[in-house]
């Protein structure tokens, strides 16, 4: 049996109410107790991405991403606005299409009567569908109190329409016998379709022994006295706060003085003023009523534990979570003797007539003055609350699902196709939809066709596709893309994509056609679907924050946004970067921290730096709670990086010069941090001392090195002992590596340092600065130097040569390095790739 649980009750405005508590608690219990049955959840993709993150966080310890389905539709759909009615109907159809493609046996809707004020979307089909719909009934309070709750014509229409749908449910699971009886008495639902599964509260509600410091902090935070009476509710007529205040005012003065009333209510200013005026009319001072405002769960649990008495005078509940929460925390609990509350409280002496303020006063006064009765209340609270558990509710629900399927005729799996066809026809007939709505729905329907899509692994080469500047980062992009295309990824179509500002992601098929064998078609827009993976290997800082919209959109469709982070040096040492990079990098990394699923760094050093930066900036960066930061190492085999070819005209002369004297090579774009100036000055010292050494600098001119480059162009040793080679091919670079005495890598900061690995692959010894990332990669297999004086490098070269002549120098060939194929494989291990065998 495959159970699909609609968890929108944890996304909507109900999130801060009882439904918001019971939705994750009940669904998690079903997952935990499902045994051999498969359980998935259905999430509404029209809510903000932070909302979706919260839902996924609530289940990530129990479900894989494969069992978290996000349905797409076009917002806004709130029924309260008549202009949304067409989109609302279309969203219901889109949800049906999503469910048909998920193909569950049971669709379990924990909260049904929603969608009037936000994008909550739920419906029960009137036609035959290949799944059974089971709805939870929390209460029918609006139906039983029409004058109070259904006075607004728009809401009345909405509620009555939902009620008509509700009556089509294959089964109703009520959270109390009282709620079940309401369904049987006041709807057309037969009693054999109604089951009481009860309810419960989380394990976090418990008796806790708080420290004196914690108690004092609560007192300070909420202006609490040493002892107090507690009540909890929303401000609405059925919660009966007026009667509670009236009854409290009738208590003897000494009890009022000793036990102020703490009202854990979230109130608007005008509501607060009205209640305080009411209290004053009963002779109460404002100091006798303490309003806490909204409470965190931790603080609420603490107040339950610390209160002298908890009182719940509600006129109508479907279940009544607050009394059960209070009793689980050991609080002496009193409540109304009507609707569902007798089932929860379970002791007649602890209840009162909520319509009779004298009766409320009587029971409160007895609890506060009769010590024996008070002790019984405390003991009863723990005994009674122990009868309720989410595990019991889950077992009852699963038994109900099983009986429902056993008593039903088997459905034709082919009906899923007919559901899609009929819903598409229905959408076409909705006149209220604009052309923009219809275009959005077309994308939504495509996204909701989960099973029809082969998963996609999409390599973002947004920079490379526009221009290959042949930087180290672009070598990474070329190499990773090449390996993934060559090797493939089981269960995924591998392709390249790019983003152009002001547009959307498109396939980089023209780039592929010009660089790889085969025909790839046109650069069509990308449809991101569930479980697709975007991996951005390029540095795209210049595209943020605009790209955030695309990232959130793909993630709301169930895809994953993953980014390779090469380094964050512009954040740590901004003086090493041009002004544009200094401006873009904080925006870029903060956006990645808040919106990406995975940050995959090119070294452990970079990963630690990224984590530290995010932690340091939490005052303005709000990290995605689902995000992981990991690392892999880059490859180094030039032959597999789609190398450039060709030899310069003076190749033989250069190679001859290299062979004529000990030659040292530096590789990389010339930038202030790379250490070229210090290295050149070091060799000038050595040349002045008469040392016959060559220095080969391989790399084009970068940012803020104009004076250095001018010096190189006019250096007296240029093309004698000093050689500056720009824009050479990978083929010729390999020749230089093979003939050099050692690589000098003097950079003050790197994310990884490909030249180090490329040198190791050629068994070329390395002389490097002792920065963390180099130590991570080279370990003891390199000769290290520190300091920023020319003499520091000159000394290191001399010391290394002495060791070299004794054949005692560190051996770079012992450095562990990866091929690009291996690097791509390690990258895949850091991605949310689903093995084909796991696909349902």
Swiss-Prot record:
Domain of life assignment: Bacteria
EC annotation from Swiss-Prot or TrEMBL? 2.4.1.371
Q: Please list the reactions this protein catalyses.
A: [alpha-D-Man-(1->3)-alpha-D-Man-(1->3)-alpha-D-Man-(1->2)-alpha-D-Man-(1->2)](n)-alpha-D-Man-(1->3)-alpha-D-Man-(1->3)-alpha-D-Man-(1->3)-alpha-D-GlcNAc-di-trans,octa-cis-undecaprenyl diphosphate + 2 GDP-alpha-D-mannose = alpha-D-Man-(1->2)-alpha-D-Man-(1->2)-[alpha-D-Man-(1->3)-alpha-D-Man-(1->3)-alpha-D-Man-(1->2)-alpha-D-Man-(1->2)](n)-alpha-D-Man-(1->3)-alpha-D-Man-(1->3)-alpha-D-Man-(1->3)-alpha-D-GlcNAc-di-trans,octa-cis-undecaprenyl diphosphate + 2 GDP + 2 H(+); alpha-D-Man-(1->2)-alpha-D-Man-(1->2)-[alpha-D-Man-(1->3)-alpha-D-Man-(1->3)-alpha-D-Man-(1->2)-alpha-D-Man-(1->2)](n)-alpha-D-Man-(1->3)-alpha-D-Man-(1->3)-alpha-D-Man-(1->3)-alpha-D-GlcNAc-di-trans,octa-cis-undecaprenyl diphosphate + 2 GDP-alpha-D-mannose = [alpha-D-Man-(1->3)-alpha-D-Man-(1->3)-alpha-D-Man-(1->2)-alpha-D-Man-(1->2)](n+1)-alpha-D-Man-(1->3)-alpha-D-Man-(1->3)-alpha-D-Man-(1->3)-alpha-D-GlcNAc-di-trans,octa-cis-undecaprenyl diphosphate + 2 GDP + 2 H(+)
Gene3D superfamilies (alphabetical): Glycogen Phosphorylase B
Q: Which InterPro entries match?
A: Glyco_trans_1
Q: Which UniProt keywords apply?
A: Cell inner membrane, Cell membrane, Glycosyltransferase, Lipopolysaccharide biosynthesis, Membrane, Repeat, Transferase
Task: Outline the segment boundaries, as ranges, of region: Alpha-(1->2)-mannosyltransferase.
Answer: 2-399
UniProt similarity note: Belongs to the glycosyltransferase group 1 family. Glycosyltransferase 4 subfamily.
Subunit structure, interactors included: Monomer. Interacts with the C-terminal region of WbdD. Interacts with WbdD via a surface-exposed alpha-helix in the C-terminal mannosyltransferase domain. However, the C-terminal domain is unable to interact with WbdD in the absence of its N-terminal partner.
The miscellaneous remark of the record is: This enzyme is specific for the E.coli serotype O9a O-antigen.
Protein name per the record? Serotype-specific mannosyltransferase WbdA
Lineage here is: Bacteria, Pseudomonadati, Pseudomonadota, Gammaproteobacteria, Enterobacterales
By which gene is this protein encoded?
wbdA
């Amino acid at each position: 049996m495959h159970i699909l649980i609609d968890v929108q009750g944890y996304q909507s405005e109900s999130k801060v109410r009882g439904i918001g508590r019971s939705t994750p608690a009940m669904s998690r219990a079903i997952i935990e107790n499902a045994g051999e049955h498969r359980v998935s959840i259905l999430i509404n993709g029209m809510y903000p991405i932070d909302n979706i993150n919260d839902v996924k966080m609530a289940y990530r310890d129990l479900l894989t991403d494969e069992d978290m389905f996000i349905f797409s539709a076009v917002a806004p759909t709130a029924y309260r606005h008549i202009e949304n009615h067409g989109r609302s109907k279309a969203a219901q159809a889109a949800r049906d299409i999503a469910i048909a493609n998920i193909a569950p046996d049971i669709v379990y809707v924990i909260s049904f009567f929603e969608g009037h004020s936000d994008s909550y979307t739920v419906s029960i089909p009137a036609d035959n569908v290949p799944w059974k719909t089971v709805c939870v009934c929390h209460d029918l309070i609006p139906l039983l109190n029409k004058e109070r709750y259904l006075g607004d014509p728009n809401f009345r229409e909405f509620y009555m329409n939902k009620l008509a749908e509700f009556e089509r449910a294959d089964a109703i699971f009520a959270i109390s016998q009282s709620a079940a009886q309401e369904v049987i008495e006041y709807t057309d639902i037969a009693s054999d379709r109604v089951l009481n599964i009860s309810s419960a509260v989380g394990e976090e509600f418990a008796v806790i022994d708080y420290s004196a410091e914690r108690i004092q902090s609560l007192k300070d935070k909420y202006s609490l006295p040493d002892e107090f009476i507690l009540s909890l509710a929303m401000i609405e007529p059925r919660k009966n706060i007026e009667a509670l205040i009236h009854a409290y005012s009738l208590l003897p003065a000494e009890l009022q003085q000793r036990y102020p009333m703490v009202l854990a209510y979230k109130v608007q200013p005008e509501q607060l003023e009205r209640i305080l005026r009411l209290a004053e009319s009963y002779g109460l001072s404002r100091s006798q009523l303490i309003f806490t405002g909204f409470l965190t769960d931790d603080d609420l649990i603490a107040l339950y534990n610390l209160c002298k008495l908890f009182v719940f005078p509600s006129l109508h509940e479907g279940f009544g979570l607050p009394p059960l929460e209070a009793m689980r925390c050991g609080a002496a609990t009193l409540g109304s003797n009507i609707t569902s509350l007798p089932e929860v409280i379970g002791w007649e002496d602890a209840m009162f007539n909520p319509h009779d303020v004298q009766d409320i006063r009587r029971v409160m006064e007895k609890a506060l003055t009769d010590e024996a009765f008070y002790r019984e209340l405390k003991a009863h609270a723990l005994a009674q609350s122990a009868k309720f558990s989410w595990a019991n509710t889950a077992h009852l629900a699963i038994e109900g699902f099983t009986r429902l399927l056993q008593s039903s005729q088997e459905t034709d799996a082919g009906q899923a196709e007919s559901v899609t066809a009929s819903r598409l026809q229905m959408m076409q007939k909705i006149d209220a939809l604009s052309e923009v709505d219809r275009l959005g729905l077309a994308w939504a329907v495509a996204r909701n066709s989960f099973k029809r899509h082969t998963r996609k692994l999409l390599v973002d080469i947004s920079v490379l596709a526009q221009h290959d500047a042949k930087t180290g980062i672009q070598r990474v992009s070329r190499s990773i893309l090449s390996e993934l295309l060559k090797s493939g990824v089981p269960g995924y179509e591998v392709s390249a994509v790019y983003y152009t500002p002001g547009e959307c992601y498109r396939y980089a098929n023209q780039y592929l056609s010009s660089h790889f064998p085969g025909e790839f078609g046109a650069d069509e827009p990308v449809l991101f679907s569930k479980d697709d993976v975007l991996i951005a290997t390029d540095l795209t800082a210049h595209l943020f924050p605009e790209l955030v919209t695309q990232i959130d959109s793909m993630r709301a469709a169930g895809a994953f946004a993953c980014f390779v982070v090469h380094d964050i040096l512009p954040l740590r040492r901004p003086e090493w970067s041009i002004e544009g990079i200094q401006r873009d990098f904080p925006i870029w990394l903060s956006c990645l921290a808040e919106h990406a699923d995975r940050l995959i760094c090119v070294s452990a050093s970079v990963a630690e730096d990224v984590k530290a930066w995010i932690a340091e900036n939490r005052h303005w960066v709000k990290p995605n709670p689902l995000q992981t930061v990991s690392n892999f190492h880059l490859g180094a085999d030039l032959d597999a990086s789609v190398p450039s070819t060709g030899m310069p005209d003076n190749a033989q002369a250069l190679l001859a010069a290299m062979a004529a004297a000990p030659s040292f090579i530096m590789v990389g774009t010339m930038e202030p941090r790379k250490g070229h100036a210090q290295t050149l000055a070091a060799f000038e010292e050595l040349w002045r001392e008469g040392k016959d050494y060559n220095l080969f600098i391989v790399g084009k001119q970068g940012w803020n090195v104009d004076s250095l480059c001018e010096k190189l162009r006019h250096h007296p040793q240029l093309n004698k002992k000093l050689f500056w080679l720009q824009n050479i091919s990978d083929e010729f670079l390999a020749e230089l590596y093979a003939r050099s005495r050692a690589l000098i890598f003097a950079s003050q900061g790197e994310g990884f340092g490909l030249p180090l690995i490329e040198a190791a692959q050629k068994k070329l010894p390395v002389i490097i600065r002792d920065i963390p990332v180099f130590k991570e990669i080279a370990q003891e297999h390199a000769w290290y130097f520190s300091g920023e004086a020319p003499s520091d490098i000159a000394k290191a070269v001399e010391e290394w040569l002495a060791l070299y002549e004794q054949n005692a120098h560190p051996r770079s060939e012992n450095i562990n390095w990866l091929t690009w194929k291996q690097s791509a494989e390690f990258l895949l291990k850091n991605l949310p790739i689903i093995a084909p065998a796991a696909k349902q």
